[in-house]
Amino acid sequence: PLSVMVNEEDHLRLQSLMSGLRLQEAWSLVDRLDEDLGRELPYAFHHEFGFLTSCPTNVGTGLRASVLMHLPGLVLTKEITKVLHGLSQVGLTFRGLYGEGSEVVGNFFQVSNQTTLGKTEEDLVDHLDRIVRQVIQYETHARQVLLRDARQVTEDKIWRAYGLLRYARSLTFEELMNLLSGVRLGTSLKLLPELRVYTLNKLMIFTQPAHLEQAAGRDLPPAESDSHRAAYVRRVLSTEGAVQSEGTGSAGNQTGEDPE
């Protein structure tokens, strides 16, 4: 879960990625590596401003802590704008699936600290962790509101998404992500009880253009890539077992894996 990028946005970028809300654990890994490198490399450091990074927005601690969250409940109940505005008021910001400059697809929001100056790394991580847990509570409540006030519409949206994924012959990546968002919501609400979050994560990763081209062993034009993507999704879902359309299960809280 640990990687180092050299001469990217800054001279060094140490990165730890983990599933679930494990910010402290991820930070500890990066911190240990940073200490080891710091004994060998002459980091540019100022007693007042902290680490002097190539990118001005990283000056200070140089730390960017992020959490990728799936927030369909807040989007569907039209509460997301209020929540995102609240994040900006407490020193956090949001980006799309691929980070800075990327669009939000599939109701995935990357929430991170906005500034790195004037606080310790521990303070930044603790603050993000605390606010993210509040957002999870808002999302959980929004999902229950959907079940209580718009259950039929919500179930229809979920099953339509599942049906398209099961039988579509062509899917763009954006279309896939939006459909997976509906199915992921259905899984967390126990409306699609036979599907695992692991499977949905797998579909998110291995249907991206480079993965499809690696599997095909050649470059794929967009239309052919969309066809390969749909075929891969059908194959994965068929091996997971068909979900019986009659049994929608009972409404429940989100799983421990969601939202992330």
What are these regions (language model features)?
Residues 1-48, 63, 75-77, 81-260:
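Long, Pro/Ser/Thr-rich low-complexity/intrinsically disordered regulatory tracts in eukaryotic proteins
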Residues 67-73:
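Alpha-helical support elements that line or immediately flank enzyme active sites
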Residues 50-67:
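Conserved phosphate/anionic-ligand binding catalytic regions in large, soluble enzymes, centered on
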